[in-house]
């Protein structure tokens, strides 16, 4: 997947799931399943329910995404 093909949206973490997966509610009200990107995992950035995050979505499957940024409160 090329970097230009991704869709970036903001959302709020609703629930924490096993294996660094999260349920994220997007701005438009849709709920998706998202995993943590490698850089966030590498720098031990903790993501908790209620955090605002940026999610990258693939145009091929809009129900799964990758968390690329956690906003500072």
Swiss-Prot record:
Transit peptide among keywords: no
* Compartment list: Cytoplasm
Major subcellular site: cytoplasm
- At the top level, the lineage of the source is Bacteria
Keyword hit for RNA-binding: yes
One GO molecular function term of this record is: translation initiation factor activity
List the keywords (alphabetical): Cytoplasm, Initiation factor, Protein biosynthesis, RNA-binding, rRNA-binding
Pfam family name, one: eIF-1a
List, alphabetically, the SMART domains matched: S1
Q: Where is the S1-like domain?
A: 1-72
Q: Which GO terms describe its cellular component?
A: cytosol
Which SUPFAM superfamilies does this UniProt record tie to the protein?
A: Nucleic acid-binding proteins
Family annotation (InterPro entries) = NA-bd_OB-fold, RNA-binding_domain_S1_IF1, S1_domain, TIF_IF1
Instruction: Summarize the protein's role.
Output: One of the essential components for the initiation of protein synthesis. Stabilizes the binding of IF-2 and IF-3 on the 30S subunit to which N-formylmethionyl-tRNA(fMet) subsequently binds. Helps modulate mRNA selection, yielding the 30S pre-initiation complex (PIC). Upon addition of the 50S ribosomal subunit IF-1, IF-2 and IF-3 are released leaving the mature 70S translation initiation complex.
Record's subunit section: Component of the 30S ribosomal translation pre-initiation complex which assembles on the 30S ribosome in the order IF-2 and IF-3, IF-1 and N-formylmethionyl-tRNA(fMet); mRNA recruitment can occur at any time during PIC assembly.
Q: Which family does it belong to?
A: Belongs to the IF-1 family.
Protein name per the record: Translation initiation factor IF-1
Q: Which organism does this sequence originate in? A: Lactobacillus johnsonii (strain CNCM I-12250 / La1 / NCC 533)
Upper classification of the organism:
Bacteria, Bacillati, Bacillota, Bacilli, Lactobacillales
Q: Which gene encodes it?
A: infA
């Amino acid at each position: 997947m090329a970097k230009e093909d991704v869709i970036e949206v903001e959302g709020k973490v609703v629930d924490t799931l096993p294996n660094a997966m999260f349920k994220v509610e997007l701005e438009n009200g849709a709920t998706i399943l998202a995993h943590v990107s490698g850089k966030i995992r590498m720098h031990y950035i903790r993501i908790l329910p209620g955090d605002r995050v940026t999610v990258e979505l693939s145009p091929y499957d809009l129900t799964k995404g990758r968390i690329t940024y956690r906003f500072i409160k």
